């Protein structure tokens, strides 16, 4: 069964979530600062989401009343990143399909093995904010569509029989979040002797920033990049030493993700190449045990490409001689001089006990030697045995 991937235009990476406060008319942020979309009246909104105009990203939209969103610069940058990731994902799927098709063509009887998928995020199909939030990185759990992902967070390991519980998945997701800092508990009690610039934990000025579930605050990434222009930002602005800590954590996560992606690609390529190759052994092809006949020795390299100075290889001659000996041994048979005949008549026994001198190749046989009877003699002289 051939595996093929049909290129389908996917608009999910162009989808943005519409600001609910903007729909109510209460959003205080302009469209150039809000992390959600502020569509115009001509835009088509479905289920609180809007599709961005692809021509607008390329700067070539000439429609007067375009039904697609023309995103502001900060959302346009995020959409371009999502588009590149989507293109890389499609290329990986096409490459994987070609490898599976080639392996299946070389081994028709072998079933296609499923590719292990690793998912460390909740279901994108049920979490709209995670699926369409432009400030969250485009997390690609695997090559599986979002509609068939599990509804509960789950880590799928290489062994499908051993799933990781949701608590471990949440812990892994927490470790991957590099935009959060733990709040100093001593600062919350008013007992922290270290200042804001010396403490390794966050000292937020506003208690509404603190997430009560894990006692953390979300860091303003725009402030770290030096471009936060909000008068009253709801995210934490960390001091210099905590900014360095966040940048180091982001660097480690990116390096680990790149190393894991390279290792996965190398393992897939190596497994595909290994499955298409096998060592050529003459003893395996002839059905002869390895101990009986040694493998064919390698031919020494020639001095010239035309083979004019080829040297006689004694290994080839020994190999051919061993094959000839094996064929001679298979065509010969051994028979006792006096066959055991149960319940035979005297005439039959006398016919069976023929003199050994009448047997070909046994004229010089002594009483202690077993005569060798050829296969042609066995076919021409039939011995009758009664059971």
Curated annotation (Swiss-Prot):
Physiological role: Mediates pre-mRNA alternative splicing regulation. Acts either as activator or repressor of splicing on specific pre-mRNA targets. Inhibits cardiac troponin-T (TNNT2) pre-mRNA exon inclusion but induces insulin receptor (IR) pre-mRNA exon inclusion in muscle. Antagonizes the alternative splicing activity pattern of CELF proteins. Regulates the TNNT2 exon 5 skipping through competition with U2AF2. Inhibits the formation of the spliceosome A complex on intron 4 of TNNT2 pre-mRNA. Binds to the stem-loop structure within the polypyrimidine tract of TNNT2 intron 4 during spliceosome assembly.
A Gene Ontology molecular function term for this protein is: RNA binding
UniProt organism field: Rattus norvegicus
InterPro entries named in the record: Znf-CCCH_Muscleblind-like, Znf_CCCH
Biological process per Gene Ontology, one example term: RNA splicing
Q: Print the keywords alphabetically.
A: Cytoplasm, Metal-binding, Nucleus, Phosphoprotein, Repeat, Zinc, Zinc-finger
GO CC annotation, single: cytoplasm
**Protein name from the UniProt record:** Muscleblind-like protein 1
Q: Where are the zinc fingers (C3H1-type)?
A: 13-41, 47-73, 178-206, 214-240
Q: Which Pfam family name is an example for this entry? A: zf-CCCH_10
Protein location = Nucleus; Cytoplasm; Cytoplasmic granule
Q: How does it assemble?
A: Interacts with DDX1 and YBX1. Interacts with HNRNPH1; the interaction in RNA-independent. Interacts with RBPMS; the interaction allows cooperative assembly of RNA-bound stable cell-specific alternative splicing regulatory complexes.
Report the sequence similarity comment from the record.
Belongs to the muscleblind family.
Instruction: Name the principal localization, coarsely classed.
Output: nucleus
In terms of PANTHER family, this protein maps to: MUSCLEBLIND-LIKE PROTEIN, MUSCLEBLIND-LIKE PROTEIN 1
Q: Which residue positions does Phosphothreonine occur at?
A: 6
Reply yes or no: does the keyword Metal-binding apply.
yes
């Amino acid at each position: 069964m051939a595996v093929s991937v049909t290129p389908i235009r996917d608009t999910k990476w162009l989808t943005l979530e519409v600001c609910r406060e903007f729909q109510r008319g209460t959003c205080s942020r302009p469209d150039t600062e809000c992390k959600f979309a502020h569509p115009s009246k001509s835009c088509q909104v479905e289920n609180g989401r809007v599709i961005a105009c692809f021509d607008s990203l390329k700067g070539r939209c000439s429609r007067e009343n375009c039904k697609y969103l023309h995103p502001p610069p900060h959302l346009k940058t995020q959409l371009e990143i999502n588009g590149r990731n989507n293109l890389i994902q499609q290329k990986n799927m096409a490459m994987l399909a070609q490898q599976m098709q080639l392996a299946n063509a070389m081994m028709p009887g072998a079933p296609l093995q499923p590719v292990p998928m690793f998912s460390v995020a909740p279901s994108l199909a049920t979490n709209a904010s995670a699926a369409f939030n432009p400030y969250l990185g485009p997390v690609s759990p695997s090559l599986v569509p979002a509609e068939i992902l599990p509804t509960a967070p789950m880590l799928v390991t290489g062994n499908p029989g051993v799933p990781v519980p949701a608590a471990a998945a949440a812990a892994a997701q927490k470790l991957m979040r590099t935009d959060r800092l733990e709040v100093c508990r001593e600062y919350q009690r008013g007992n922290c002797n270290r200042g804001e610039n010396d403490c390794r934990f966050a000292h937020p000025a506003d208690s509404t920033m603190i997430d009560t579930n894990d006692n953390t605050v979300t860091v303003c990434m725009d402030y770290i990049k030096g471009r936060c222009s909000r008068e009253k930002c709801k995210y934490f602005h960390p001091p210099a030493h905590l900014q360095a800590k966040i940048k180091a954590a982001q660097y480690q996560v990116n390096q680990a993700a790149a190393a894991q992606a390279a290792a996965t690609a190398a393992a897939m390529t190596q497994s595909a190449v290994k499955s298409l190759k096998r060592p050529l052994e003459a003893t395996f092809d002839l059905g002869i045990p390895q101990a009986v006949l040694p493998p064919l020795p390698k031919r020494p390299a020639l001095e010239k490409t035309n083979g004019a100075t080829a040297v006689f290889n004694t290994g080839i001659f020994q190999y051919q001689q061993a094959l000839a000996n094996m064929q001679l041994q298979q065509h010969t048979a051994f028979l006792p001089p006096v066959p055991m005949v149960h319940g035979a008549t005297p005439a039959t026994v006398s016919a069976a006990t023929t003199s050994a001198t009448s047997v070909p190749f046994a004229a010089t046989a002594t009483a202690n030697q077993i005569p060798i009877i050829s296969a042609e003699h066995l076919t021409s002289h039939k011995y009758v045995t009664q059971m």
